[in-house]
């Protein structure tokens, strides 16, 4: 059987290696665990590395697997939450070849916007995609520090392949800083084709 498969692959211009799965972690084959000598599951070292990577990028430890549809009332609200989960999971799976480059999560508190944004950032980080997750307040602090001679935070924020900004609109408005720096960040990321996700409690009119 294996010889037949190899023959078909070669005829198609492929090799047996193209047919075999390619794992990011050869130790656990991307399962997240290995088996000890007595058969117990042991957390793979790759999970600790991913945990450290997420922490360094400011990414909360959330995952789509933890999404609990029962947390939402049965009916339209739950259906909407599930639809948003599926859309964002597909966004993360297809990154960077996404249907839309950017996304904005709108709505009042309690709809899971921050959680879903965190799930996207975490999933991308697990794929070794450079990610930055910041709250709007943190972003504003970085802008203010740079404006008064501090480190250049804007350049790194512009370059990162995926930027997640949580709770836009909760930050204080600083004259000549908040709007001006945010506009520069958004315009430069759009110009360079970078992907961005934002969550906010503001309405479209307030934005």
Positions of PLM-derived features:
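Loop/turn-to-beta-strand initiation segments
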Residues: 129-130, 159-162, 192-198
